[in-house]
Amino acid sequence: GKNDYEFLPNGSYQWTAKKYESKLQNLSKVLGSLSRDLVPEGPAFIGVAEAENSRVLEDLVKQPAISNYEFVHYEGPDRRGIDCALLYDPKQFSVTHSKLVLSTPFEGDTVHLTRGFLIVDGQLAGERVCVIVNHWPSRGAKSPVRVHAARQVKALKDSLMRSDKKLKLIVMGDMNDDPM
């Protein structure tokens, strides 16, 4: 099982139904207001780096501010129950294929597996667009662990681009590092 007990009422964060509902409302208000000044419909998709499970995502997209969104999520290997997901507006972006590509262990470490790479392929404004949602290891891990994740994303990108040279590819998420 997943080690996410700290988010229960008796856990260290003392989550209650009231706290949960408040979090959903606040998150949905922020997400619902993103880019509205530039794109009245809002973003076509939003990458999520720390989703606990599909139930939480279902509850989130039921909120009035983002009820037009659907989501893609796969249960990943992270022992804390933290996964990547993609929220998307089906009127703007139609999903044609999705999968979770598991990360390979860094130097054989199978205990501290990262969340994997969520790949979502679809159509946006008549063009094929592929999104890779990431959540790389934290800064508590050594830099080579994040470099290892970056190399895996590059290999995924190279493979996708070999099959379609005109592919529009977006890599997003929490890379737990500063831009270079």
Which role does the model predict for each range below?
Residues G1-I82, A150-R151:
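N-terminal, active-site-proximal structural segment of metallo-dependent hydrolase catalytic domains
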Residues A49, N134, G173-D174:
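Active-site flanking residues adjacent to catalytic metal/cofactor-binding acidic residues
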Residues Q25-L31, V111-D121, R151-D158:
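A Trp-anchored, charged/polar loop motif used as the substrate-binding/catalytic surface
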Residues F45-R128:
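Structured beta-strand-rich core segments of catalytic domains in phosphoester-bond hydrolases
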Residues A149-M180:
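Metal-dependent phosphoesterases centered on the DNase I-like endonuclease/exonuclease/phosphatase
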Residues G1, S12, H97-K99, R128-S138:
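Active-site-proximal beta-strand elements of phosphoester/diester hydrolases
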Residues N53-R55, R79-G81, R139-G140, N176-M180:
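Active-site environment of divalent metal-dependent phosphoester hydrolases
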